[in-house]
């Protein structure tokens, strides 16, 4: 119903026989088929956007972490983390700070919730000899008892087939290699009452995800539940992402966009999946809303 309400073309429910015609190695009682579903290369998109910004006279300031955004008299200034104030004044500012969105928003005068709790997700690439077993993208039916979607299959732009991600608490908002931890980030979620309320409600899901973190065999078994021919597939680690999961003080996960206006400053407090894939459409919406003021 949501797909139809949003005008997604061609989406329909199919039975097990048609499922096997579309994905011969996939088992299930039925499926929701979306023939126009697409994937993108986030890296290529980001690189092209950067090129366009520079072509239009814009600047991309690397190694310049933002401390807070200050508004006075209808003008917005950017104060860097070291206290230096950026030399340009803006009439509008849109903050898309991802994993740091709650901190930047609070320092800039917005409220402190929802808070970002980081969850990492590991992807694996399956053995080249098995990638033909899946033709497109296959997702499990979400279990409403658990907060995350589960392991799914994604065919990348380069033709490689990935499975993943799992979902487990990250011991650092920028801990992409999985070999370090940030004590300030750990204290930030461990001292948040909402985190413990969430954890208490989701112990079964936590144990299930922990198995996929410590055991690649468990990870493969999750995927093989609906593509049994991959039960013995070999996998190698691919990318590891960190999800900026917004969480309310009562432990509820925020599953929709949270866009807050604070004067002439707009904070994107939550942008759930598929935020990256849909980033251009989301950007158009945000800019359109800001320009209406």
Annotate the PLM regions.
Residues 32-92, 96, 278-291:
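Helical element adjacent to the flavin cofactor pocket in flavoenzyme catalytic cores
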